[in-house]
């Protein structure tokens, strides 16, 4: 956008007709039970659920959740009675397509995945997004992931699971507006280097303000 700043842009601030704001909540892992109950409630209504983890496999050097661990956790919580799918970037193309097809047609009710579902996935009956270790993702990524639900007139929910109370995560509780979220992200991260590769940090201008003086 900096390089092509002289180009005309279109700004769309309205949701498609009938879409509702996604109710978003930051939840500590010790309070996960309320989320699991909500998942069960939504599935009984015929709806579906995304669960996102930052890792594919368990690592001795990391306490981050992974898709395999979460598959076991959710399978145990629901006594193996809810059909689930697992999706991640190491799977072969035909495997990924099969998992997504099963989820789209409702054969699986919970899809446990890495961020490969961030864009390009449209399942209108998906009404719950649960993101583990949410503090490890940027606001833009979290907003994109949240956008996988709320794709119909059904009320949808997003739960950000995080053991530490991170101020920036509450921005997503406050708003569904991508423009507002990007501005808050700008405030947290700084403007970075306009003429280099640094994407965060303060440029330390004495007078200029990038947002105020962009024209």
Walk through the language-model features, giving the residues of each.
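Conserved interdomain linker/interface between the two RecA-like ATPase lobes of SF2 helicase motors
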Residues: 3-71
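C-terminal helicase module of SF1/SF2 nucleic-acid helicases/translocases
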Residues: 32-47, 68-215
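P-loop NTPase nucleotide-binding module
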Residues: 1-2, 115
